[in-house]
């Protein structure tokens, strides 16, 4: 069974984990409503790619 050869300090451990990070969502400006929304998703008004896909 594998065992650690040296102790990893708290700072080394946190530095390693600090590179993992979080991804920022891709937010775009909606042309029809002028509001921000997540890219490649239907807007709350039901418009996607300039076309009405969900009737309200």
UniProtKB/Swiss-Prot annotation:
Keywords: Ribonucleoprotein, Ribosomal protein. GO terms for molecular function: structural constituent of ribosome. It comes from the Bacteria. Residues 1-23 are annotated as: Disordered. InterPro entries: Ribosomal_bL32, Ribosomal_bL32_bact, Ribosomal_zn-bd. Residues 9-19 have a biased composition (Basic residues). One of its GO terms (biological process) is translation. The keyword Ribonucleoprotein applies. Pfam families: Ribosomal_L32p (PF01783). GO terms for cellular component: large ribosomal subunit. Belongs to the bacterial ribosomal protein bL32 family. This is Large ribosomal subunit protein bL32.
